[in-house]
Amino acid sequence: MTAPPTILVFDSGLGGLTVLREIVSARPDAHYAYVADDAFFPYGHHGEDEIIARVVPLIGELIAAHRPDLVVIA
């Protein structure tokens, strides 16, 4: 039997908990890491380059820390 997957859910604002709830419903056996970026909210007030400059390194750090099998950006 294989180990349950680890799923990282990155919430960029509103709606991430709804996404997480649906994923948990589909995969109740998985391990979860949920991270909300409240400090940069709302993302709509930032330009594309600014968002990329923030999110790419942050997701990289989260992947290194949690070693997920799947990353969901909500």
What are these regions (language model features)?
Residues 1-74:
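Non-catalytic structural scaffold of enzyme domains
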